[in-house]
C-alpha cells in the first residue's frame, strides 16, 4: 500500500492591495482634522496624465456596494471595481522626505510611470 502525503499551506493569500501603516496613520490624522468620522479614503484610477492613466485620492462618506474596502488601524480605504483592476498588487504608502510629503502608489502593473509619480500606463 502506497501512502500519499499532501502538504497544504493554510496561510492566507496575500492581500490584493497593500495599505501601509504609514498611509493609514496619515489618513487618520487628516480625518481628525476634518472632524467627520464617516469619511473614508477613496483611491481611484482615471484616464489622463502624461502616461495615459493617473491616480486620484478623495475623501468619501459613501461605500458603494461594489467597492473593495480595506480596513487598516481604524481607517477604511475604498476602491471602485474599475480602479481595482489596475491596482491589484499595488502598495499605497505615505512618505515624508526631502522632496516633501505625499501619498505614493507603488504599482507592479505600471509598465511606465511619469516623473511626477501620479501618472502611469499598463
From Swiss-Prot:
Family matches, as Gene3D superfamilies: HesB-like domain (2.60.300.12)
Cofactor(s), by name: iron-sulfur cluster
Binding site for iron-sulfur cluster: 50, 114, 116
GO biological process, one term: iron-sulfur cluster assembly
Pfam families per the UniProt record, alphabetical: Fe-S_biosyn
MF (Gene Ontology): 2 iron, 2 sulfur cluster binding; 4 iron, 4 sulfur cluster binding; iron ion binding
Cofactor note as given: Binds 1 iron-sulfur cluster per subunit.
Keywords from the UniProt entry: Iron, Iron-sulfur, Metal-binding
Family matches, as NCBIfam families: iron-sulfur cluster assembly accessory protein, PRK13623.1
Functional summary from the UniProt entry: Required for insertion of 4Fe-4S clusters.
Stated family: Belongs to the HesB/IscA family.
Subunit structure: Homodimer.
Protein name in the entry: Putative iron-sulfur cluster insertion protein ErpA
Record organism: Bordetella petrii (strain ATCC BAA-461 / DSM 12804 / CCUG 43448)
Lineage: Bacteria, Pseudomonadati, Pseudomonadota, Betaproteobacteria, Burkholderiales
